[in-house]
């Protein structure tokens, strides 16, 4: 992976001595369906091409483990689907992955930037009114970007790790089962930048000793701006509302 290095996340290590640990081991599992509006452009270093991308329903699944061991970070693993199809009629020649597509040609595109997030974090605050987590995340991308003209497909694979900082804030409303939250993951290095932001509300449907069940309604915004990641250049945006369920044992 070129030009990307960890720029955020050191605060989590610095503050780890003050981090709070769970009194018992907690297991979280969740699933979300995300309605994305997609836009942007991509290329392979000879100029990016914009496409009219389709809106898609994406899915996301995660598990997290929190524990009482001091100084050892908690862990969260999240699988993210990130796929879209596009189409355009070229107004000028477009060189993609060593193949030239002529002006006035009608081409389609396929973007798959699905990835797995691995997050290590500390709980700096953890109570019913306010909870704040800080740490670092690695996005393991298994990407495929392709141009199609007729039955011919020309694609390039882009695999690697994108490190980002991680922050998660939760604010509980006293006397209710309602919680508001925000999650931020971001990095900017040279001409590349990635952000993944979420805001939402969570309502507790089940509150028992055995488990908690939460309904989530939120909005997520991902932007992936790459400058020569395995030869890929991009400025792609995926954003929209989502609905989810989370269970806490």
Feature roles, as predicted:
Residues 19-25, 68-74, 125-132, 174-178, ...:
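Short loop/turn motifs that connect adjacent beta-strands in outer-membrane beta-barrel proteins
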Residues 27-31, 63, 75-79, 120, ...:
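Membrane-embedded beta-strand positions of outer-membrane beta-barrel proteins
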Residues 37-52, 85-111, 141-158, 190, ...:
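Flexible, solvent-exposed loop segments that connect beta-strands
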Residues 31, 61-67, 118-122, 136-138, ...:
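Residues on the lipid-exposed face of transmembrane beta-strands in outer-membrane beta-barrel proteins
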Residues 20-83:
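Short glycine/proline- and aromatic-enriched beta-strand/turn motifs that initiate or cap beta-hairpins
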């Amino acid at each position: 992976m070129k030009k990307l290095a960890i720029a955020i996340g050191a605060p989590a290590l610095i503050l780890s001595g003050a981090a709070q640990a769970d009194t018992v081991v907690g297991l979280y599992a969740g699933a979300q369906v995300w309605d994305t509006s997609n836009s942007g452009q991509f290329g392979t270093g000879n100029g990016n091409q914009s496409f009219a991308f389709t809106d898609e329903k994406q899915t996301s699944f995660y598990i997290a483990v929190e524990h009482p061991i001091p100084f050892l970070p908690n862990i969260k693993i999240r699988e993210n689907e990130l796929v879209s199809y596009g189409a355009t009629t070229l107004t000028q020649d477009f060189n993609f992955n060593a193949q030239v597509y002529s002006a006035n040609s009608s081409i389609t595109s396929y973007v798959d930037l699905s990835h797995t997030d691995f997050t290590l974090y500390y709980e700096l605050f953890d109570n019913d009114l306010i909870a704040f987590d800080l740490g670092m995340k690695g996005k393991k991308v298994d990407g495929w970007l392709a141009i199609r003209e007729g039955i011919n497909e020309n694609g390039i694979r882009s695999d690697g790790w994108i490190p980002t900082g991680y922050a998660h804030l939760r604010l509980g409303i006293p006397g209710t089962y309602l919680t508001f939250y925000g999650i931020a993951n971001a990095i900017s290095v040279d001409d590349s930048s990635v952000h993944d932001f979420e805001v939402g509300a969570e309502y507790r449907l089940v509150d028992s000793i055995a488990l908690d069940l939460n309904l989530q309604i939120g909005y997520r915004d991902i932007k992936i701006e790459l400058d020569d990641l395995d030869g890929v250049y991009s400025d792609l945006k995926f954003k929209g509302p989502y609905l989810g369920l989370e269970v806490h044992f």
